[in-house]
Regions:
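Feature primarily recognizes SF3-like P-loop helicase cores of small DNA viruses
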Residues: 1-28, 32-188
Length: 188
């Protein structure tokens, strides 16, 4: 699942309209995976996701030109925040009106962003009677393995330096596998 999702992120459009949640014990590799993903995609294509700001007037403008939105080490109530329901539109292919400071006219963006969220606890979701839509969009991977005995500083950089081309090939294979899944089942 993670391989396919990383491949999807390289593609840049969220075809299956899903968001990835990596939750579980600290020091188990969740943030390392996200740092590697950012490096593969390019920092210029990534933006921090702030659910508490999603309902604000100019927040969506921050996502213009981005393909990956990340919420790293978020609190357990991250999906309970006032603007969290906008996430469904950000990944669901919906047209979104965006306002930018200093511009008189709003413009449209398509909500096909890839979204990954990491958390050391299980996230709680404000359903607002829309449990089906949330269930359809959430992909959850639990990190329950014990942390390593010895931490390697800047492990993401070490892995990218030593295994970068292999990781890119792994992600591309994941995207090929996802495309096959989408042809066969329409989903992961």
């Amino acid at each position: 699942l993670v391989q396919k999702w990383v491949g999807l992120s390289l593609f840049g459009q969220n075809l299956p309209q899903r968001l990835l949640i990596l939750d579980g014990k600290p020091n188990t590799g969740k943030s390392t995976l996200v740092l590697i993903l950012q490096a593969l995609i390019g920092e210029e294509n990534v933006c921090q996701l702030r659910t508490e700001c999603l309902a604000e007037r100019f927040e969506l403008n921050r996502f213009r030109g981005k393909t990956l939105l990340i919420g790293c080490d978020v609190p357990g109530d991250f999906l309970m925040k006032r603007g969290a329901s906008v996430l469904k539109s950000l990944v669901g292919g919906d047209p979104l009106s965006v306002e930018a400071k200093g511009l008189n006219n709003a413009f449209q963006v398509k909500g096909d962003f890839n979204v990954v969220i990491t958390c050391n606890s299980r996230l709680r979701v404000r359903l607002d009677g829309d449990a089906g839509a949330w269930k359809r969009r959430l992909l959850i991977v639990r990190y329950d393995a014990p942390p390593p005995q010895k931490r390697i500083q800047h492990f993401d950089g070490v892995l990218l330096k030593e295994e970068g081309s292999g990781m890119l090939n792994w992600a591309l294979l994941g995207f090929a596998r996802l495309k096959e899944d989408l042809r066969e089942t329409g989903d992961f």
